């Protein structure tokens, strides 16, 4: 038997789940070939739910992430068909949980599409990225909403929130890094805050421009406590313009202040708080107490990520402007354009159908009129013949 025939028989045995036949064929040198769609024996075993056959093939060294001609892996097959046990054994053997097919859909997308809740939970457990978007800009959560599956939607929503909380680099989370240079533009020119603050001690320093900076030490409380402490500490700074500028250091106690480095800068008629701590997230910031603040405070993030203004008599709430990623915005625009084009085409098609119906109706009216004229002529002939017959009888 040729190698080609052995390869074909191996595919058939894997499809049928014949473990012994698979072992015999591999022992006889059957190659791991694919069919015309690029489907390997492992694809077939995973697709048709043959757990033991899948294990035999994996132990024999069949590629766990083999791709078909549409880039589907065995994990895609098993997840799409809802074979949770096969999904798990593939993942345990190191299958790529976030592999994408030609539609940029992962196993999680396919499991959600076919409402396989057990498989969805298993994929999330093994680290599937719930934020991944398909070619149609759909996450697994979007698909569950489209399918009306509330249970899956809830599971995926919780998973999305958990991944955001454990991933500080999530696009919806504001994170500030200490490596970003800090500059304040004041009446005296541009001031580099990095040079104003010592790297070790909590201190207050002043430069020649009259801009003062306060740096606080480390702690483990929330950013809200940080800004509250900074607000209280800023009260004496509001009168800094009335006192002579000195180059001495003044230690400030801030045990409740969070983060590695916090800076308060007073310049002109306002105070600027710049948070330069590495890894601080402002997701839990709601309001800042304003007692003791005599002038506005501006909290500035690096690169202009966020600006929070606290008037002296108001309580400011965090405002986070979250823009869609450029790729998603482009996808949304493409979808909107497609919808608009589809509506225009539909209107044009309806108008064509209406025009065609009007033409048909006009044609039928003309035919009816012609028939009526023929009927009238025939009736007149009958009347003439009747009169003629009557006259003959009278004679």
Curated annotation (Swiss-Prot):
Keywords recorded for this protein, A-Z: Acetylation, ANK repeat, Nucleus, Repeat, Transcription, Transcription regulation
Positions of modified residues (N-acetylserine): 2
Transmembrane segments: none
N6-acetyllysine modified-residue sites: 69, 352, 381
PTM per Swiss-Prot/TrEMBL: Acetylated by EP300/p300. Deacetylated by SIRT7, promoting heterotetramerization and activity.
Major place of residence: nucleus
Annotated compartments: Nucleus
Region called Transcription activation and HCFC1 interaction, residue ranges: 258-327
SUPFAM superfamilies recorded: Ankyrin repeat (SSF48403)
Complexes and interactors: Heterotetramer of two alpha and two beta subunits. Interacts with HCFC1, causing repression of transcriptional activity.
UniProt-listed PANTHER family: ANKYRIN REPEAT PROTEIN, GA-BINDING PROTEIN SUBUNIT BETA-1
Protein's UniProt name: GA-binding protein subunit beta-1
Species this chain originates from: Homo sapiens (Human)
Gene it is expressed from: GABPB1
